[in-house]
Amino acid sequence: MEAPEYLDLDEIDFSDDISYSVTSLKTIPELCRRCDTQNEDRSVSSSSWNCGISTLITNTQKPTGIADVYSKFRPVKRVSPLKHQPETLENNESDDQKNQKVVEYQKGGESDLGPQPQELGPGDGVGGPPGKSSEPSTSLGELEHYDLDMDEILDVPYIKSSQQLASFTKVTSEKRILGLCTTINGLSGKACSTGSSESSSSNMAPFCVLSPVKSPHLRKASAVIHDQHKLSTEETEISPPLVKCGSAYEPENQSKDFLNKTFSDPHGRKVEKTTPDCQLRAFHLQSSAAESKPEEQVSGLNRTSSQGPEERSEYLKKVKSILNIVKEGQISLLPHLAADNLDKIHDENGNNLLHIAASQGHAECLQHLTSLMGEDCLNERNTEKLTPAGLAIKNGQLECVRWMVSETEAIAELSCSKDFPSLIHYAGCYGQEKILLWLLQFMQEQGISLDEVDQDGNSAVHVASQHGYLGCIQTLVEYGANVTMQNHAGEKPSQSAERQGHTLCSRYLVVVETCMSLASQVVKLTKQLKEQTVERVTLQNQLQQFLEAQKSEGKSLPSSPSSPSSPASRKSQWKSPDADDDSVAKSKPGVQEGIQVLGSLSASSRARPKAKDEDSDKILRQLLGKEISENVCTQEKLSLEFQDAQASSRNSKKIPLEKRELKLARLRQLMQRSLSESDTDSNNSEDPKTTPVRKADRPRPQPIVESVESMDSAESLHLMIKKHTLASGGRRFPFSIKASKSLDGHSPSPTSESSEPDLESQYPGSGSIPPNQPSGDPQQPSPDSTAAQKVATSPKSALKSPSSKRRTSQNLKLRVTFEEPVVQMEQPSLELNGEKDKDKGRTLQRTSTSNESGDQLKRPFGAFRSIMETLSGNQNNNNNYQAANQLKTSTLPLTSLGRKTDAKGNPASSASKGKNKAA
């Protein structure tokens, strides 16, 4: 049949059947070996043809029940194109047998061919015209409504597995057909006995090895052999299929699949006999399929008894071919495989077909197989206890993992089960970073925990650290995995890595643990700071009420603008002996302001700097008095009153003020402690960033003194800061004064520099009482110095912090702009300081101690910012001084407070500028 595979029925000369069959016989054995799919038509030995063909022809009974059963699986028919059968179940069933018979007939060339084609004709259409038997008409009719499926024509080679199954079911129908054809076969015809069938099967066996498709027939043949008489014809019929099938072993496998179908065989006796045989073979095949090799079993001696091992070998061959197809990912071949047993096929490692497809990365093949086999197979584990998803992770097949996790039930494996770890455990175990990254992203989207532990209490970080995969550890840490968890052995991941000798991983994990603990501490400190801020706010509210009460008293007593604590205050002239109380009270707000600034800075540095800055600005405005933004003049007046009157009222209010100041000092210490800690944590780096936001709050240019002091030495500033924080409000000021004196050197007053601009501003503003001015000046410088000291902490720590570079880059413009003028400004300021200090140094000292406290506390608010900016930006103290000076003058108009204060404070700032330039 090899040559005429695609012949038209008309072209076949049935009178020439003998020669035709001879040619096909010559080629068939080779073909069978080459192509299992074509074995049906070609794989029949000439000797077997005589018996088998006659028996087949004799057994031309039309199947009815089995045909129906078989119709469910309409495999691509194993018949040569000539035999294209209609899709009738009978036809389909008979097609395989008929095809086989046709081949046999043609090969036999004897009268068998003639009759058999008739049988085949109905089913296959190949034998239709030659049909000598009574069924030729049927064959013709079937040919007429026969529809050529491209699958049948083109996929014939691959039909073998499905066709085998089909042929198996067809075998029963074929048996019926054989009954019809018994008279037809002239050679063995009705006489064909089990012996003939056996001989045919044995003859066919050598070729059968290669054709699993025929195994169903073989199995049926063996069953038929049991029906030796009438069934003997069927047996022979079946035996030809055996011959063609060439897989005595496979029949067993298929018999397993088709046992039920054979049972449904209309011929009860046939079914009975077939069933025991098939069952025996099927079970035997399952148990011993691996035991027997088809070649050995194929020997002509093999008969029905030997068909079991033969079928097994055939089954093994089929399984092997399926495994190879899946390994290669040839999806086009899959449809031609028998689909019933796919889920039972495993390789030597316990891998099912899904394991194999996933491990090889054949995503399309995996999807197709999953649809055929069902998603339950995705839960099977191989000898390594890996599911297909786990095996895909082991082999780094990201696409397969992606599809299984996102599209199938394998998503359940993202969580640890009672007995098995999760997929990220496998990814960490096998070092698959890319897959781990995708899994973590997916788990984050799905809200699945990354810290689930396996039965040993190991998290994914533990597993990755035990196997030394640093990249996986880093990926897990980036996605927030917990590195401090302990497994059942009480080990952290870092300890596990150390125990396994992965020092690099353990070091990395130790660093991460340290950072985590620091971060937790920072969080705690932030909470504390927030609480303290709340306390401060309440204190500020109380102070505000107190100040408002003092307001009326303060306004009643006018005085020369002695205290230039704020630029506007220079113009305002209010002096009252009672104002001392106010000034003292005001000093507390100043301290609180400073504290609040620090607190807000540290807090904002940890969280959202900008948002917190705005909030802190609002709080500060409230603390300073809601009037700061609205009524700057009033506040300036108040500050003047407080400063001037501070000394007189100090004694009366000493006790409550001291208490408050102690409280404030304590708060301040806490704040500075937290600030220093945050600085070390590189949190302070954001302080400068936050300060620019506060420019609006910095209404007064006080930094002259601060800058001078900072110029002289940062160390002295540090000492002063420490003293400042440690000392209560009253003591603080004298320290700062001393420091400023020593630093200035020119004048006894700490505010030598600031005094000059202050005097100027006062003169243009009100031109009254110069002595008061100097006294005010020291007050202003002292606050400046305190603010500078406070600020100094942040810049110093900033130098150490990694973010200091960022700060410097941000403030670079300031540094560049003011670098040169710094020297000039320093000189003039020093000179001015010298002159003014000489004149009014004593008074300044005396009042500065009292007023200083008020001013310092008040000053730090504005000075703090400018100094923060300048210090953080320019790490040279010299630059800091001038940058602060100019910054204040330049920025004042821009700030919300500055606009109002500028009107009053402008003369001072302009005067200071002019003097600096002149010098």
Curated annotation (Swiss-Prot):
Outcome following mutation: P81N: Decreases interaction with SIAH1 and formation of cytoplasmic inclusion bodies
Tissue-by-tissue expression: Detected in brain (at protein level). Widely expressed, with highest levels in brain, heart and placenta.
Compositionally biased region (Basic and acidic residues): 686-700, 833-842
Cell compartments where the protein resides: Cytoplasm
Disordered: region residues: 80-99, 108-140, 287-313, 549-615, 666-713, 728-919
Coiled-coil residue windows: 515-552
Listed Polar residues bias regions: 299-308, 844-854
Intervals holding ANK repeats: 349-380, 384-413, 419-448, 456-485, 603-632, 699-729
Family annotation (Pfam families): Ank_2, SNCAIP_SNCA_bd
Ranges of biased composition (kind: Low complexity): 555-571, 667-685, 774-785, 874-886
GO biological process, one term: cell death
GO cellular component, one term: cytoplasm
GO molecular function: identical protein binding; ubiquitin protein ligase binding
Note in the entry: Constructs encoding portions of SNCA and SNCAIP co-transfected in mammalian cells promote cytosolic inclusions resembling the Lewy bodies of Parkinson disease. Coexpression of SNCA, SNCAIP, and PRKN result in the formation of Lewy body-like. ubiquitin-positive cytosolic inclusions. SNCAIP isoform 2 is particularly aggregation-prone. Familial mutations in PRKN disrupt the ubiquitination of SNCAIP and the formation of the ubiquitin-positive inclusions.
Illness association: Parkinson disease: A complex neurodegenerative disorder characterized by bradykinesia, resting tremor, muscular rigidity and postural instability. Additional features are characteristic postural abnormalities, dysautonomia, dystonic cramps, and dementia. The pathology of Parkinson disease involves the loss of dopaminergic neurons in the substantia nigra and the presence of Lewy bodies (intraneuronal accumulations of aggregated proteins), in surviving neurons in various areas of the brain.
PANTHER family from the UniProt entry: SYNPHILIN-1
Identification of the protein by name: Synphilin-1
Organism: Homo sapiens
Gene giving rise to this polypeptide: SNCAIP
